[in-house]
Every structure is written in C-alpha cells, then in structure tokens.
C-alpha cells in the first residue's frame, strides 16, 4: 500500500489502524536544535482526540504521544523523529456484524476490491483515527513555523448543516476572536452560531443521523515566495494535503467557488504602495505565496456510520440492510479543525525549506 507519506524536505509518513495496537509516524526533515518534547505536541492532540465533549464520538482515547527518536536532551537532532500513540478503547466486537458486509459511503468496498482484504474493525487504515499522527507531526511543524518565522496556522468551524456563522465575525482576519474559537467545543468564532450548532447536533444524535460541515484554515505572516510552479504550486500542494483528510469532498482557496459570479474588476487583488487592497486569491498568486494571509476552506461530508438503516451488499453481492453500530461522530467536521491546521502547517514548512534551499 503506497501513499502513506507527504512532503519532500519535510516529510511525514504515518502507519497504524483504528483498532490496531498503535498508531505511529516518522517525521523527516525537522531542522536540528529546536526544543521539543511531548508537551509541545499533546495540546493539539487533545483538541482532536475523541470523547472530549458530548458532540463527538464517545470513544475514549487518551492519545498520549511518545517521542521514540530524533530528540536528545530536549532538542531535535536533525534525524528522523519517531512518534507513537497506543490505542486503548477499540471495542472491536462492535464491528463483528459487518465483517462480510460493506458499509455504504465508506471505504469498505473499495479497499476490498483493491486489496482483496480489509480490516473491517472501525475501517482499519481508512479510519479518521489515522489523523492523530498527522496532528502530532503538524504540531512539530506549527512550532517551528511559529518560533522561526512568526507564522501562525489556525482554523475555525464556519458551518454545520444549514447553520452558518455570521460572516462579519471573520470579515477581518486580524480581528478574529481566537480566544472565542478556543473556548468552545465547536472551534467557532461566533457565539450565536455555537448555540445553533448545539441544537442541531442534539437533534441529530436523537435521530441517529449525521451532518456535514465546512471549516476554514488561516495562515498568517507567511512570506512571499513559497510554491514551486508549475506542478508543485503552493495551492496545489495545499489542496492535495487537505483533500487527503478523511471525509473532505471539496477544497477552496480564497474566494473559491464564489469566483464564478465575480467579475475580473472585482476579483483582482489591486495593489498600492502600501500593499494589497483585497485578498480574493487567498494569499496565493500563480502558485506562489503573496505575503497575504493564506485562507483555505474545506467541506466535509456527513459520516456514513449512522443508526439509520441503509441498503448495501455483502461479500457475495447479496442485498443486506445495515445499521452501523459502534461509537461515531454525528459531525466529523468538529474534530477536523486541528487536522486541517496540521496538514496546512506540514505543507508550509515543506515549502519553506524548499524555498530556503533554492532561493536564499
């Protein structure tokens, strides 16, 4: 199985399954002499881990990360950093009924057809549990970006179902209330929308159903020049990284799909001696960072693991009806915010190292 690594100079390789013994990753390319300990990584993992609020899956995992290599006397050595997280609350028996059945909307069918075998327990490698290691690696990238370049990578939830935040709360990137984002389980900058999210999720849990979501990632203080045209454009690599997150079905950079209705006179980001007048492009022009905040949005589908009966087939292509047991998120977008931040940080650090190697 290929496709387990991302990045060139800053490279992250993950391994492990949802109900396996452990999850792990190897992080290559971290510059030497950066202070690093588990305490630098754990806060982001705590933001992603399950069982932290009534709005997410009740599966309980401490997600305590252990650094296995690449750090000596509290500092990175420049060698590969090995990270591991032990699984503790698998409850694989919940999945016995689907051992020979394909959950509709999941990767069960495609994994079985491609490999001729699959780990049906919680989705195995296709489970979003794999993203814990992305968050761990991303925490390292975020620390280096922040300490060495002053780059901040942060995200927020902007929509669940038909409940949206007030656009005015995020109209000025520099005035987003990040303390408000950190203070609620929805990572939401709009306290009014938080109430709407709460009501919607309660209703969904009662119905045994799920819903989709939209979130935004913002990277501030990114220097001009990141990106390698033409095939390794910064926006192309960023879209690739964000699309690799489980359940993501669409990525927008800047104004995204709204550009369809804009005229050129409106969309172009005009310039003055003081700088850009607008940021419709989302901080990337011609595949290269412009120095403005990088803004990306992602849309996540509703999870297919629900209590509402659905039609599918088994390994013998016979019709079956499924109710997915187990513990699942009514909205996977809620815990996706730190994952999207991590993937953005990984791409930015990779491109920063490539920029320094080639241009300065």
From Swiss-Prot:
It comes from the Bacteria. NADP(+) binds at residues 48, 54. Homotetramer. Its EC number is 4.2.3.5. InterPro entries: Chorismate_synth, Chorismate_synth_AroC_sf, Chorismate_synthase_CS. One of its GO terms (cellular component) is cytosol. This reaction introduces a second double bond into the aromatic ring system. One of its GO terms (molecular function) is chorismate synthase activity. One of its GO terms (biological process) is amino acid biosynthetic process. FMN binds at residues 125-127, 246-247, 286, 301-305, 327. Reduced FMN (FMNH(2)). Its cofactor is FMNH2. It is an enzyme of class 4 (lyase). It catalyses: 5-O-(1-carboxyvinyl)-3-phosphoshikimate = chorismate + phosphate. Belongs to the chorismate synthase family. This is Chorismate synthase.
């Amino acid at each position: 199985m290929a496709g387990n690594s991302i990045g060139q100079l800053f490279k992250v390789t993950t391994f492990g399954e949802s109900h396996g013994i452990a999850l792990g990753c190897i992080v290559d390319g971290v510059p030497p002499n950066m202070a690093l300990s588990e305490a630098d990584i754990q806060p982001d993992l705590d933001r992603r881990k399950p069982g932290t609020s009534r709005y997410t899956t009740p599966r309980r995992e401490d997600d305590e990360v252990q650094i296995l290599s690449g750090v000596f006397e509290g500092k990175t050595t420049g060698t590969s950093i090995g990270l591991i997280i032990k699984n503790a609350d698998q409850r694989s028996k919940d999945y016995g009924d689907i051992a020979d059945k394909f959950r509709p909307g999941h990767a069960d069918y495609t994994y079985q057809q491609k490999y001729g075998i699959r780990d049906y327990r919680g989705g195995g490698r296709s489970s979003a549990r794999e993203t814990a290691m992305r968050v761990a690696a991303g925490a390292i990238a975020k620390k280096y970006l922040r300490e060495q370049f002053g780059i901040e990578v942060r995200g927020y939830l902007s929509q669940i179902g038909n409940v949206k935040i007030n656009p005015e709360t995020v109209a000025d990137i520099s005035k987003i209330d990040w303390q408000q984002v950190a203070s609620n389980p929805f990572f939401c900058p709009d306290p009014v929308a938080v109430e709407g999210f709460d009501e919607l999720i309660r209703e969904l849990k009662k119905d045994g159903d799920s819903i989709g979501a939209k979130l935004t990632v913002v990277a501030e203080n990114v220097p001009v020049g990141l990106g390698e045209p033409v095939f390794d454009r910064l926006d192309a690599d960023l879209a690739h990284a964000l699309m690799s997150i489980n359940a993501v079905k669409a990525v927008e950079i800047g104004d995204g799909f709204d550009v369809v209705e804009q005229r050129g006179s409106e969309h172009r980001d005009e310039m003055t001696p003081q700088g850009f007048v607008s940021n419709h492009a989302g901080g990337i022009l011609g595949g290269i960072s412009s120095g403005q905040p990088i803004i990306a949005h992602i849309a996540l589908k509703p999870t297919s693991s629900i209590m509402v009966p659905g039609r599918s087939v088994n390994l013998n292509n016979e019709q079956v009806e499924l109710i997915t047991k187990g513990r699942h998120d009514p909205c996977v977008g809620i815990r996706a915010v730190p994952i999207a931040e991590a993937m953005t940080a990984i791409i930015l650090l990779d491109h920063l190292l490539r920029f320094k190697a080639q241009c300065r």
